[in-house]
Each structure stands twice: as structure tokens, then as C-alpha cells.
Amino acid sequence: MARFYLTTAIDYANGDPHMGHAYEKIGADAIARYRRLRGDDVWFVIGMDEHGQKVQQEAESQGRDPQDWVDDVAVKFRRVWERLEISHDDFIRTTEPRHQQAVAALIEKIDRNGDIYTARYEGYYCSGCEAFRKESELVDGRCPLHPTREILSMEEENYFFRLSDYRDRLVAHIEAHPQFIQPVSRRNEILGLLQGGLDDISASRSRVSWGVPFPGDPEHTVYVWFDALPNYISAVGYPDEEFERRWPAALHVIGKDITRFHCVIWPAMLMSAGIELPETVWAHGFVMISGGKLSKSEAQLLDLERLVDRHGPDAFRFVLLREAAWDSDRDFPTVQSFLDQFDARYEADLANDLGNLLNRTVSMIRKYRDGTIPAVAADPGADASGSSEIGTSLDTASRKALETWSDAMDAYRLHEGIEAAMTIVREANGFVDRSQPWKLAKDPAATAELDAVLSSLVRALVTTAVALSPFMPGKCAEIWQRLGGDGALPDPIGIEGRLPDRIPEARSDVLFPRPES
């Protein structure tokens, strides 16, 4: 069984969860669920980044103790992830003792390697990034990621990390391991950044009290990124022996705005400490409205709870990942256009195509076979023309779509995985129209043909449920149950041997209810 350690960026505890947080977690969860279907030993970690100046300032503005503040924020995030069916195995928080011990151990190891020294920093600081910035990185005197925030001039004595020493090793690793930074556009961005050389970076702050004490110097706290990045190893037991059982990570899932930290600083820290690098860092794009600029009233319309309530958590997961390619940005011109597309996609793909296919299939099996699913095996040698026998064309299309789905999911092209699954649904609906089971049912000589049609439709629905289960775990389990399936969904290669025998009693509710007009 292959090990697959998967992480997302930990969420900063200075506000409420929003659609951007959800997009990353849902995508990573789909990958985790797919890998479990493949039989991998998956360990999936998410969490909270709870230290730093912004958290301290936010808590103080509310008259709160920072620890009490982050405890409450963590509860909000946990509640949302539970509602969205995020199947994480661990939820790491940077205020936990296990994390702080790991940070201290890592810094001590880097220090023993001679890569920590003290110096005075003079330059610019972006409070939005909580990062020091070179003048060459600014656009019109502002941070390009936080153009509404004022850039601060700062001077303080800090501990520094010799990042500049790792430029050549980083380039060599990236060029030798093409999969290390994905998609390719992000890899090229990082290689371009490295061509200009690297400066050493601060590893501590002397003016921020809310953080992990810097090892050996309580007057300093660990710089927020030096604190946050090691969560990926603290969550799996670093520096204890159990750490080796899960590390290295197979995949770090992050947003495109933090590639510099994850593809330059983090691997350099690991190199210094003699720790193996993660296999892949995947930097996804953003889902945006009008380039990300929203009024307060527009932001309220995109409240995460309200969006999930609109059509339910599974539909939200499905539509978000279907509409937004995992490797690029998706920008909607207005909030209303996003909501309209959400509704249109829900009605077309789920209520109409998938929901109607399930309803038609179940109804015909009840009507024509008294609820018993015909035991007709798929023809493993069927050709794409479907000329050999009724049912062959749909079985062939389903198999081909499942191969396309598997290739897309292996490449983390999640929207293409969804499209492959929906190809089966469209093929199945067309197959019903072409084969006309209602006519076959009236012909006593067409019994075998009708059995083949109904059996192929059930296979197509089960295949669709398996393929869409990483995206809609609840609804796909319900499809399986409505077809008479028992226990968990079959794995992708075990569908034929797990087909149900009988459709259960009719239910009054529909799988994807249409909203009341």
C-alpha cells in the first residue's frame, strides 16, 4: 500500500473562513478521497496558523487574549470543514505544544548547520504578508499582494537564515525533479525568481510577542513563516522516530500567492536540516469576483454558510471544482454572475442530468423487473461502436470515461475528472433515448435486450457514483444506497463484482431537489 501524505496551507487565524479557504480544502479533500479509492495509505492534514502580528492586533482590537481568540476561530473553521465533509486525519494548530517543540528542534538543527546568525534589518515590511520586502518587489511603493496596505519602513535586530546559500541547490533540485513545483507555470515563476539570486531572511522578530519563543533567546519570537511552515513536519511527529513513517509529503497544496515561501524558503530550511523535500508542491489559482474586489454587501452574498446552504455541501463542492480549474484563476464579473452560474450548473448537471438518470433507471427497474436488477455482465471485449449487443456501447463509454477520469485525477486536474464522470451521465441519458426500454418492455422477445439495457444503466450509475465520490461523498453514497448498494462504494476496479441485486423501497424525496421558485 503506497503512502500518500497530503497537506494544505494552514489557515491564518485573523478572520472567518471564506470561499478561498473552502476551494483549497475541497480540492485537497477530493485528492485524498481519490487516493483512498486507489487503495493508498492516505494521511491528510489541515490546520491553523495562529501566531503573528495580525492575530495579536486582531485579538487586542476585540479586547481579547490572543489564545482565547484563536481558540474561537479554530472552532469556526472546524465547524465549516465538518459541514463540507473534509476528511482530514489531523488538524494541526501552531499554538499546540507538539508544534512548538518541532519548531524549536528544527531551528536548533539549522543553527547547528551554521545557517543562523544575528544582524540588523533595515528595509520594508508588508503587514498583509507579514513579510519583509525588497524595494524591487514593490509596485508603486506597495506590496503587489496587498496594494491597499501601507508598506512600513522597519529597522530591528533579528536572527537571520542563510537563504542565499541555497540558491544553486534549489535550482538543481527543481530542474532535476520536474514534478516538484506544479503546475508548470508556477515552476517557471520560481526558476525566474531564483535567477535573480536570494537574500538572507529573518528567522525571528523582536517586536512581536505573540509567537513561539526563539530557541536560546526569549527576547525574540520565531518569525511567523519560520513558525508556520514546519507544521508539515510537526503534524507527523517531528523530531521523533514516528516522523519517518509519514514523511516526506507526497503533496503540499497551497495558493499561488505563497509559492515563494513553500518553493524557496521551506525547501531551503529542509535542506539545511538534512530533511528530505516533499515530492510535489501544487499551487492552485483563485476563484475571484471582479478581480477580488468586493463591497461589504457583495461579501455578505458570498458568505460561506449561505453558499453551502444554497444547494447543500455536496453541490457546493461539485460546482466550485467544476467551474474553477485547479491550475488557474476563475474570475466572475459580478457576484450575481457567480450565483447564477452556481444555480445553472446545479440544475443542468445535477438536478437534470444525474438526478433524472437515477430516477429513470430506478423507476424502470421497479416497473419492468419488480425492483430486481438484471444480472447481465458487461462484455469486456466490447467495441466502441456498440454493434455487438445492446448495452455494449454504454459499458464501453463508461470504461473509457473511467480511464480518462483516473488520468485526470492522477494529474490533479480535478475539473477534468468531473467532466469525465459527467460524460458517463450524458452517454447514459442518450443511451436511454436510443434504446427505448419502454418499447422493449412491450415485446416478449426482447427480454434479454431489456435486461442488458437496465443492467448497463446500473453499471453506469455506479461508475458515476464512484468517480464523483471524491467531489460529492454524501450524494454519491446516497446514489449507491438508492440502487440497493450495501456498505461503502466499490473501488474503481471492483465495480462489476459489487453491483446491487435489488432496488430498495421507493423514497419520496429527490436526490437533487430544485429550489422553490
Features from the language model and the residues they span:
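Long, amphipathic alpha-helical stalk/connector segments used for oligomerization, subunit docking
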Residues: A325-S328, F332, Q336-A351, T361-P380, ...
